[in-house]
Amino acid sequence: MDVMFDNLPSALPQIKAGKLIALAVTSSERSAALPDVPTIAEAGPVKGFDATSWFGLLAPAGTPAEIVNRLQQESAKALGSPALKERLLSQGALPGGMAPADFGRFIAAETRKWAAVVKASGAKVD
């Protein structure tokens, strides 16, 4: 049996076309795009499972704070647009956004989380 993990925006067209079957979503909550598909935590033995893909806008170190803040404000404005929000939701994406300092903490937490998973798995680079 072939199985894969993919992010929802790229897999959703194939699921809707009947070319793929969604067994579960990896987020902690069901997706509005696939409300009948359970989460992994609901469907199986992995309680508390939560693994989502995310995208961020980053700038080079040393970028002036006023530029970073302007980029964040304009991004938040775009993501708050009803048209863009609806488009992203229809593709299975969840529009979000964080202040720069919060996003930095989020990235650090994700790095710690996945470093622990890699260490526990014993995976090594060949």
Language-model region placement:
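Conserved, function-defining micro-sites of small-solute handling proteins
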Residues: 1-126
